Amino acid sequence: MKSRNGPLRVGIGGPVGSGKTALTEKLCKAMRDNYSVAVVTNDIYTTEDAEALVRMQALPSDRIVGVETGGCPHTAIREDATINLQAIAGLNQRIPDLDVVFIESGGDNLAATFSPDLADITIYVISVCQGEEIPRKGGPGITRSDLLVINKKDLAPYVGADLEVMDRDATRMRASRPFVFSDMKRGDGVSSIVSFLREQGGL
């Protein structure tokens, strides 16, 4: 699909340690054989996430760009997305046939949102390790993202999180918006997320 911005732009946000980079890796590996894919990662002072994706062999290195946002990471995806838009423009110039660009935000809080000028579809990632109460705490990431991913479901028994409670709270907080439980270590939930992107993104 070519959106009004060119390739479909998928924003991936969430707190530090929720599994954003693991999700980005799994999506790249699941989609790269059928689509032309690239990634822009955001870190405050380094390009660590971009380097990690290269090490994971998610994509060739020329399809992964890391940007250093400085300051608050949410600014670079919402108030002033210039640095990300420039990175995407560079990818488009280098790889004209791009179908999808994943934009991975730096670790942020529950109030983080993507500018509509930057992302066509938004995915927000939380972890059961942050506590079963996270879905009911709300915030734009929980309530307004196009897809909520509740990651690390395999660790629920070890951190005292009740998945049924999280399911109930996510259903209530998100109304009709979809969410999925995942375990990125084993790849559980990835196929559902890819299907969502195909359907909602017109891929």
UniProtKB/Swiss-Prot annotation:
Taxonomy, superkingdom:
Bacteria
Q: Where does GTP bind?
A: G14, P15, V16, G17, S18, G19, K20, T21
What subcellular compartments does it reside in? Cytoplasm
Principal location class: cytoplasm
Function per UniProt: Facilitates the functional incorporation of the urease nickel metallocenter. This process requires GTP hydrolysis, probably effectuated by UreG.
- Family recorded in the similarity comment: Belongs to the SIMIBI class G3E GTPase family. UreG subfamily.
Its quaternary organisation is:
Homodimer. UreD, UreF and UreG form a complex that acts as a GTP-hydrolysis-dependent molecular chaperone, activating the urease apoprotein by helping to assemble the nickel containing metallocenter of UreC. The UreE protein probably delivers the nickel.
Question: Which named protein is this?
Answer: Urease accessory protein UreG
Species of the source: Rhizobium leguminosarum bv. trifolii (strain WSM2304)
